[in-house]
Structures are given as structure tokens and as C-alpha cells.
Regions:
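N-terminal secretory signal peptides that target proteins for export/translocation
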Residues: 1-7
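Bacterial N-terminal signal peptides
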Residues: 9-21
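An N-terminally biased module of ancient metal coordination in phosphate/nucleic-acid-related enzymes
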Residues: 25-102, 122
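Active-site gating/metal-coordination segments in enzymes
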Residues: 34-40, 90-211, 215-216, 265, ...
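Hydrophobic faces of well-ordered beta-strands that scaffold small-molecule active sites
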Residues: 48-52, 72-75, 103-107, 138-140, ...
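Acidic-and-aromatic substrate-binding clefts and catalytic sites of carbohydrate-active enzymes
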Residues: 51-59, 78-88, 112-121, 148, ...
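A general structural detector for well-ordered alpha-helical segments in enzyme core domains, enriched
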Residues: 61-64, 91-95, 122-130, 162-166, ...
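H/E-rich (His + Asp/Glu) clusters that bind or coordinate divalent metals
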Residues: 215-229, 234-376
Length: 376
């Protein structure tokens, strides 16, 4: 390791830089228009939606994504409402082949038969198949901690020793683990105390995940504590804590998580509304959070699309949501949300920060995932 340069060396470097600047002529300060994007720039800026779930042929969806300037990371999930994992994998591989440089995907594994001695080998085979076909990450879902039970009836947590070979492999091979553990804190609150209407709607439609009605199930704190123990045991693991790390109700909590785990990033998928809710009350706090952690936040929408590809209205709604997110981050417009009462303003982030959130952080985390020449 080389020693840090001394004061004299630093002075010489600074003097040389100053001389170069003078020789080139003093550059005029960037205009406000050059430092910020506008709403109209949306379709002209290269972006990555690093959290979608796309099934089937998805030709309409991909046409809209391309028109809107998006590359995508489609994430396979062990979710009963989605197609079987093998079918999800085939759809993701097909998309990647049909849209080279535009689509990347993350694999997952089934927890079916988890209590069986044969489970570990089956999970390994699923992951091997995904990696062989180009997967750039692995997703673990909220069923771990909220649904999966062991042979004795206890809930299986993310730090269970049987996951250790998988996590250790990802850490060793520098493969990203995407983790959705727990749910919004609203999940543990009565309906009348929930902050946003979309959470009320989701938990009415999915009562099996509405933890307020299931006090016998693990608490929000217990699930996240198990996740954090897993991360402490694997300090070199690259971890994408999706959905603002399930700490969406307070950006200070998200900040503390990022400070504790320097190899973790977060995405905003399906949690932008919680940032908007906080911005309606303290916009500068939310803006400061995004500015401070600009290198560790990824844009994601959590769009689920397909396998039906016949409804143009569905694609139009996705475009509208993408555009609304862009408006919130890049403009200072006065806005309203269907999810809560009251107005809020866009955060008007500098374009350098917007580029990181919308593209550069995903490229850095997932390497050459969207390289059209990347081999399987």
C-alpha cells in the first residue's frame, strides 16, 4: 500500500489542476436547466427499473418500456400468485434473449419441502439453472419469516442455518441477494391507523399476510432482526434490501440501516408512496435522505405484468405510474396522491442524483447485467 502523498505533493497537484483550469478558460456555472431534468425529459433519459415481475411474452410491456427509456430487471419470486418458478425462469430467459441489453433477471428458489433433507440439493439445482442462463441475483421473499413453517410449526427466519450454504455461496461469488423481509409497518396496524390507502387495499385482499389479525405470528421487529443477523454474519454479501428495507415509514430508519450495513443498497419499489407521504409532512427530510444516500438507492416500481399481454390499458397505467415517479423525483411540482389526503411537492433532485437512482446504482450493483454481449 502506498503512503498518502504529503502536503507538498498535494499542493503541486492542486496547482497543476488550477493551471489547467486557467488555460482552458473559466467555465460558466451550469444553468439551472442543465443541472436538473424536466418532466419532458422522461422518455429521453436512459433508465433502469430494477424491480419488476414480467411474465409471458410481454410484447406490449416491452414496447412501452423501450419507448419510456427503460431497461428492466425482472425478478423471479416464490409467490403463489405468480406462475411456477420454472415458468417464471423460462419467461425471463426468453425476454433476455429477445431483448438483448434491455432485460436482466434475478432467480429464486422454492421453499417447498424445506423440512426435508432433500430440500438443499433441490434449491441448489434451481439456482444453478438460473445462473447458467444468465441470472444476476437471487431473491428471497417475505414467505421466509411470515409463512414458511418448520416441522415443529415454528416460523422459519432468514437467518436459519439451512440457508447458510446459499448465502455463503452468494457472498463468495459476489452475487447479489435481493431481500424482501417483513412488510410495511402498516401490516401490523389496524386499518384506521394505516398511513396509505394502497396498504389497506392490499391487506384486505391478502388477509393471510395481515399480521395485525395474526398476533401469534412473528413481529415486524423480530423478522428484521433475523435479517440483520444474517447480514452481520455475511459482511461481504451484496444485499439489495428491496422496498426500502421494510423501513419505509421513516427515512431515518432506512438511513440507520444503510449506515449499519455498508454493503447494502435499497430500492424504492412499491414504496414511493411512503416517501411522498413523508414529503407531504417534511419534504426537506426526504430530500436530504435521497441526497445523502444517492449512491445506494435504486429505482424500482414493483410492476407485475403478464402472462396476459392483451390489454393496452394496463400498459398505459404502467406508463402513468412511471411518469408520476419521475415527476416526484425531478420536478418541484405540487402533486396529489390517491393514497392519502393533502398535497406534496416534487423533490427536484439534481440530474446527477437522478441518474444514479435511475441507472448508475443498478449498473454498479449488478455489473454487466444489461450488457448485450454478456454470456450466459
Amino acid at each position: 500500500m502506498k503512503a498518502a502523498p504529503g502536503r507538498t505533493a498535494r499542493f503541486c497537484v492542486l496547482l497543476a489542476l488550477a493551471q489547467c483550469a486557467c488555460a482552458a478558460g473559466a467555465a460558466a456555472p451550469a444553468s439551472p436547466a442543465a443541472r436538473f431534468y424536466a418532466l419532458e425529459d422522461f422518455g429521453h433519459v436512459d433508465k433502469i427499473d430494477a424491480h419488476v415481475h414480467v411474465h409471458g411474452s410481454a410484447e406490449r410491456f416491452m414496447a412501452q418500456a423501450i419507448a419510456d427509456g427503460f431497461r428492466i430487471l425482472t425478478i423471479n419470486v416464490d409467490y403463489p400468485d405468480f406462475p411456477p418458478i420454472g415458468e417464471q425462469q423460462r419467461a425471463a430467459v426468453s425476454l433476455r434473449q429477445r431483448y438483448p441489453g434491455r432485460v436482466a433477471f434475478a432467480e429464486t428458489f422454492s421453499v417447498e419441502g424445506f423440512a426435508s433433507p432433500a430440500w438443499s440439493a433441490a434449491a441448489r439445482r434451481q439456482l444453478d439453472s438460473g445462473f447458467a442462463q444468465g441470472a444476476v441475483g437471487v431473491k428471497i421473499w417475505k414467505n421466509i419469516g411470515m409463512a414458511l413453517r418448520d416441522a415443529d410449526g415454528s416460523y422459519v427466519m432468514p437467518d436459519d442455518a439451512r440457508f447458510e450454504p446459499i448465502i455463503a455461496r452468494l457472498e463468495r461469488d459476489h452475487i447479489v441477494l435481493l431481500g424482501h423481509q417483513a412488510e410495511p409497518l402498516n401490516c401490523w396496524l389496524p386499518f384506521e391507523k394505516m398511513t396509505v390507502r394502497s396498504d389497506r387495499a392490499y391487506f384486505r385482499e391478502h388477509p393471510q399476510y395481515y399480521m395485525y389479525r395474526h398476533p401469534e405470528m412473528p413481529t415486524h421487529e423480530a423478522i428484521l432482526a433475523a435479517r440483520d443477523r444474517m447480514l452481520r454474519a455475511h459482511p461481504a454479501l451484496r444485499f439489495d434490501a428491496v422496498h426500502l428495507a421494510s423501513l419505509e415509514w421513516d427515512v431515518d430508519r432506512v438511513a440507520a440501516f444503510l449506515d449499519r450495513f455498508p454493503n447494502a443498497d435499497v430500492d424504492v419499489a412499491a414504496r414511493m408512496v411512503h416517501l411522498e407521504y413523508q414529503a407531504a409532512r417534511d419534504p426537506q427530510k426526504v430530500r436530504r435522505f435521497l441526497m445523502r444516500y444517492q449512491d445506494r438507492i435504486l429505482y424500482g416500481s414493483d410492476v407485475s405484468y403478464g402472462p396476459d399481454d392483451s390489454d393496452p390499458a394496463e400498459v398505459a397505467a404502467i406508463h402513468s405510474d412511471w411518469l408520476a415517479d419521475w415527476r416526484f423525483l425531478v420536478t418541484a411540482d405540487r402533486m396529489h396522491s390517491e393514497d392519502f389526503d393533502g398535497a406534496f411537492r416534487g423533490l427536484h433532485l439534481p440530474r446527477t442524483v437522478v441518474d444514479k437512482i435511475y441507472r448508475r446504482n443498478a449498473e454498479g450493483l449488478f455489473g454487466g447485467a444489461w450488457d448485450a454481449t454478456r454470456k450466459q
